[in-house]
């Protein structure tokens, strides 16, 4: 282990860096407090875990609905396959009978099988209808998750607004950029097109961040 003392110049340099970082941190906190942004940023930071929980909820509800729908399809498909195969077999037998009428006993057997098939059709269709209803009910997650996603969008927009306020209030003057003839930012970044000096669109947000070098 190296026990040699740190050179005085290195120690002084490290102490100076720490002191400057502390001063900058204090200045930033004081500025935020004076601007009234400290509470707003704290609220935005607190919203992040809540947003994560809401996203987890959306993922859970979506997966649950998908699983319910798949289970219904898997339950109904064998019955539909059975109806299809039985109907095809009966059609072949009836076509053969019409092409070459068979003896009465064989015809009676064909009629009996057809009646049995017709008797089970309502059972299968009723079961399938129940599965279709379950699939439809599984889609109710969209109503709930839609509300959650809308709340998430509000949170993200609020965080973005608070961070932009910090940037706009605590940065030096930004050199003006050449404007295109069709540029809508003739009066600088705006957040409300009805109020001067406020950002109105995502393009203007991107323009501000780009001008800051972010």
Curated annotation (Swiss-Prot):
Q: Which family does it belong to?
A: Belongs to the CheZ family.
SUPFAM superfamilies hit by this protein: Chemotaxis phosphatase CheZ
Q: Name one Pfam family in it.
A: CheZ
Is this entry keyworded Hydrolase?
yes
Question: What does the record list as GO biological process?
Answer: archaeal or bacterial-type flagellum-dependent cell motility; chemotaxis; regulation of chemotaxis
Q: Which NCBIfam families match?
A: PRK11166.1 (NF008368)
What Gene Ontology molecular function terms does this protein carry?
phosphoprotein phosphatase activity
Task: Give a Gene Ontology cellular component term annotated to this protein.
Answer: cytoplasm
Cellular compartment(s): Cytoplasm
Q: Where is this site: Enhances dephosphorylation of CheY-P?
A: 147
**Self-association or partners: how does it assemble?**
Homodimer.
Q: Which organism is it from?
A: Yersinia pestis
The lineage, from the top, is:
Bacteria, Pseudomonadati, Pseudomonadota, Gammaproteobacteria, Enterobacterales
Lineage top rank: taxon = Bacteria
Alphabetized, the UniProt keywords read: Chemotaxis, Cytoplasm, Flagellar rotation, Hydrolase, Protein phosphatase
Gene3D superfamilies attached here?
Answer: Helix hairpin bin (1.10.287.500), Single helix bin (1.20.5.590)
Protein name (Swiss-Prot/TrEMBL) = Protein phosphatase CheZ
The UniProt entry, under InterPro entries, shows: Chemotax_Pase_CheZ (IPR007439), CheZ_family_phosphatases (IPR050992)
